[in-house]
Amino acid sequence: MAWIQIRLNSTNEKAEQMSDFLEEIGSVSVTFMDSQDTPIFEPLPGETRLWGNTDVIALFDAETDMAEIVRLLKEAKHLDSNTAYKIEQIEDKDWEREWMDNFHPMQFGKRLWICPSWRDVPDENAVNVMLDPGLAFGTGTHPTTALCLEWLDGLDLKDKSVIDFGCGSGILAIAALKLGAKSAVGIDIDPQAILASRNNAEQNGVADRLQLFLSDEKPSDLKADVVVANILAGPLKELYPIISQLVKPNGDLGLSGILETQAQSVCDAYTQTFALEPVAAREEWCRITGKLKTL
């Protein structure tokens, strides 16, 4: 089936109203894209943070009369002489196959591979985590996930307990278990993340060693030898009292989801309690690691 796409330049104030209207007049999907390569940092809970200049992209059936769509947009004052727009035909493709073709096995550190289930495992003797993009973020493609996976690969996790704080897909907890950890706990605020982590753990044969909790249901006395939190700088600082209490004496802490420009403020929050190591950076993101200080 072929499609017609209209791309309209808008602002963050008008983009969502334009999106609603496009759906009302027959668009089968609407997406937002950045017009000027402007980064977006941490949104508040429940907030849809958009760029100052936002492109609204709507997809219509190929039989749609786009002249009528443009007329309706003008009539509703979503389109005027100052609004740039472009209409183009979209080639019909096997989108599912193209999406799958974009994911390949990825290596992290010396031993660890993350592999989509539809790909052959590159090294049968490696530590292979089978993980498909799906219910929650975290497949190894983002620099922060990669930094955390490489850190875990470099640790001696044999017989260790691990907490994945903000577990998402469960990728870090599952990788830790397959790297030798005795047990792991995944914590998240999102029930979808708990579901995704459970499904991924079952796929990798480690579900019996992974406990999962919503953040407000975790045991009050929970502690582990290794704690990793790949969330965002703001929450990492705000949750310092909680995260630091999860680490056993002489235990290891790994933090990511942090921009390089935010690293110092996160280090400042944790430095009294942890002996921090040099910050590791990749593509403007970084990882902070350290050991809990002993009195």
Curated annotation (Swiss-Prot):
Annotated catalysed reactions: L-lysyl-[protein] + 3 S-adenosyl-L-methionine = N(6),N(6),N(6)-trimethyl-L-lysyl-[protein] + 3 S-adenosyl-L-homocysteine + 3 H(+)
EC number: 2.1.1.-
Protein origin, superkingdom: Bacteria
Localization annotation: Cytoplasm
Organism, scientific name: Haemophilus influenzae (strain PittEE)
Biological function: Methylates ribosomal protein L11.
Keyword Cell cycle recorded: no
Entry keyword set: Cytoplasm, Methyltransferase, S-adenosyl-L-methionine, Transferase
Similarity comment text for this entry: Belongs to the methyltransferase superfamily. PrmA family.
Predominant location category: cytoplasm
EC main group: transferase
GO CC term, one of those recorded: cytosol
GO molecular function terms attached to this record: protein-lysine N-methyltransferase activity
Entry protein name: Ribosomal protein L11 methyltransferase
Sites where the protein binds S-adenosyl-L-methionine: 145, 166, 188, 230
GO biological process: methylation
